[in-house]
């Protein structure tokens, strides 16, 4: 299934595709608070364009997530999120648990993501782990890779 999804990305006409093989988001209850895991994407385009972020399970199935903006406001829920980019203005998208999963004490989702656009994008991606009071515990930079072929 993962191969088929990536193959469809490659066959899309004039679309730039970025592949991130390891994403994580969720929460773990620790004592009186909850540690949060989030993957944060920052997208920048040289010209106006649309971009689509898709998230998938390790088996290649669409994965449900909440997409949150830089101010922490929910921007959408589902397995994909489309946004409009203005030239040279960064857009930040954070992955968070969907409302159905947010009530669990331990809920951590892992998988992979793609970002597609008809224009060239600069993308940075990091996984952040924070304490219940919001302090940063660790941060890992994610590199975009070429989509796998023949997996």
Task: Give short role names for the model-derived ranges.
Residues 1-4, 136:
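Short amphipathic alpha-helical segments that mediate assembly, nucleic-acid/protein binding
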Residues 3-12:
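Sec-dependent N-terminal signal peptides
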């Amino acid at each position: 299934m993962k191969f088929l999804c990536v193959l469809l990305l490659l066959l899309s006409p004039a679309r730039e595709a970025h592949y991130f093989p390891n994403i994580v988001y969720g929460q773990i209850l620790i004592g009186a608070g909850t540690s949060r895991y989030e993957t944060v994407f920052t997208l920048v385009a040289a010209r106006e364009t649309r971009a689509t972020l898709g998230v998938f399970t390790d088996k290649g199935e669409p994965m449900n997530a909440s997409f949150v903006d830089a101010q922490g406001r929910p921007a959408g829920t589902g397995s994909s999120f489309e946004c409009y980019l203005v030239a040279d203005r960064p857009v930040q998208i954070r992955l968070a648990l969907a409302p159905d999963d947010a009530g669990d004490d331990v809920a951590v989702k892992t998988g992979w993501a793609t970002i597609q656009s008809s224009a060239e994008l600069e993308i940075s991606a990091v996984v952040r782990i924070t304490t219940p009071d919001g302090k940063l515990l660790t941060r890992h930079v994610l590199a975009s890779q070429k989509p796998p072929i023949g997996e």
